[in-house]
Amino acid sequence: ALAEMLGVSRITIRQALNDLAAEGIIFRRQGRGTFVNVDSLNIKVTFSPCMELTQMIKKSGYAPSVRLLNIQKVKREEEICSLLQMQPDEQLVVAEKLFLADDKICAFCRDYFGMNLIGGEEAFDMFSKYEDSIYKYIYELSGEKAQWDKVEIDTVNPAEIAGLKKYVSVKELGLSPYLYLKTLNYSEKDKPLVYANEYFNTEIIKFNLIRQKNIQY
């Protein structure tokens, strides 16, 4: 009945329900049916699905703003170049942005990608002035969409984040540890696009996640 109401196949409905169950938005009770998880409705920011940072800030109840700190060509770091499957002679590029919530430091992002992804050397000057989402720029240029990512989670003292103190003071960063995500972003065709170091002030953005249990009884 639901498939007919929405005009889609049963397979599509089943996949959508599986996705909602994986996110904890609905849960299934054997022999009883499928129910909405009321607790999930109160979650503002979750790890999956991943949303844009400005959207996270809005959902957390703040007004977002973004500062483009720097976009530059940097010396190749072979570990990062290998993760991005870059060409042997391809230039590595890094973009640094600061995200603010009601003018307070909320997150710092350092994104690495290959020069070929943004149109090569001749396009660099134009790109270096681009302040919107890097993923939107890549999509508009190449049609490549960031579809999924692989994340390693850690914590870090904000005063120890390499290179950040040249943009802001230690006092502005606060004293609480930041959540540190090392993220490799992939396209729909499983091609690595951007390697990101993301640092979150969890006094402002609080991540929540509903997890399924897999306990052997």
Listing of model-derived features with the role each one plays in the protein:
Residues A1-V36:
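N-terminal helix-turn-helix
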Residues R28, M51-T54, K58-Y62:
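Extended, compositionally biased flexible segments
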Residues R32, L53, I134:
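A generic "binding-loop/recognition-motif" signal
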Residues F35-P49:
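Short, cationic-aromatic polyanion-contact patches
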Residues S65-Y217:
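C-terminal all-alpha effector/ligand-binding and dimerization domain
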